[in-house]
Amino acid sequence: MQITAKMVKDLRESTGAGMMDCKKALVEANGDMEQAIKVLHEKGLGKAAKKADRLASEGLVCVLVNSDFSKATISEINSETDFVAKNDKFINFVNNTTKHIQDSNITNVEALNNSLINGEKFSDFITNQIATIGENLVVRRFNTINANGGVLNGYLHSNSRVGVIISATCENVDRKKAADFIYQLCMHAAAMKPSVISYKEFNPDFLKSELTALKAELEKENEELKRLGKPLNHIPEFASRAQISDEIIEKEKEKIRAELKKEGKPEKIWDKIIPGKLERFLADNTLLDQRLTLLGQFFVMDDKKTIEQVIDEKSKEFGGKITITNYIRYEVGEGLEKKSEDFAAEVAAQIG
């Protein structure tokens, strides 16, 4: 039977396979479209199995927030190359998979693989996608947050490589206003990469080692600043608010009072001076919080205030207390070792 260009085109559109693969399948199937699809499927499965061994470190992040800001899902799905990550078929696969995860309340990869999507087992569905798209695809991680009576929102950066979701309890606060504010916090987190919400999540051993590293870093910088004749960095006693007890705060207040007395400042104005000096002490001794905690970072839209201060201001403005309860940030390829090959070796490998 003669294989026409239209037959090849129809088979390609229905399967997404390459043009030459479609032509060969039609020849093998003697022009039978259904048999040709079966041939491609069988060959595709073989190709997909080989592709599944290849490292997938590119891809996309997807953020899906429902209409009333009560539920959000974030996912990272990897491909082998940035080229495929921009492919419409891959983008649709990522969006459909994330929606399936949210709609089906799926919490882990095993449950995802065993679930049904469009009447097909997901493990078979992704294998077919690998065969069609032509690269190994991996659902690396995903998470769904329920606001549990609070409000949440999410942000996906324009390149779809960084996504954030944040939830909060919002007492007597208009949901839309709260959601809009949380969106701004998500944008901040996308840019500034906080690791945790608060210093309260830090481990004491971690803080101890980070303080040592921080001091060494600042002392090294001071060597260069001294050489240039510039003001030196303050070497902190502490790295985080977690290390500063109420007793330490009180001792610092006493130290400030003694300094003010020595300077001859009238005692009646001490109460106006002490808060500012204490704030400076805390700023100098919480550098780790400013780098790694969402609440301790300075807001990208107003770098004179920390996120915690901005939240306090918004709580007063909205007439109800806002408390951050969950924060998740994904960036494509975080922690993955990217495979590096020279171009000649890559071409040789593809030729076989």
Curated annotation (Swiss-Prot):
Places the protein is found: Cytoplasm
Predominant location: cytoplasm
MF GO annotations: translation elongation factor activity
Keyword Disulfide bond annotated: no
GO CC terms in record: cytoplasm
Annotated spans, Involved in Mg(2+) ion dislocation from EF-Tu: 81-84
Family note: Belongs to the EF-Ts family.
UniProt protein name: Elongation factor Ts
InterPro entries on file: EF-Ts_dimer_sf, Transl_elong_EFTs/EF1B, Transl_elong_EFTs/EF1B_dimer, Transl_elong_Ts_CS, UBA-like_sf
Function of the molecule: Associates with the EF-Tu.GDP complex and induces the exchange of GDP to GTP. It remains bound to the aminoacyl-tRNA.EF-Tu.GTP complex up to the GTP hydrolysis stage on the ribosome.
SUPFAM superfamilies named in the record: Elongation factor Ts (EF-Ts), dimerisation domain (SSF54713), UBA-like (SSF46934)
Transmembrane annotation, as ranges: none
Keywords assigned: Cytoplasm, Elongation factor, Protein biosynthesis
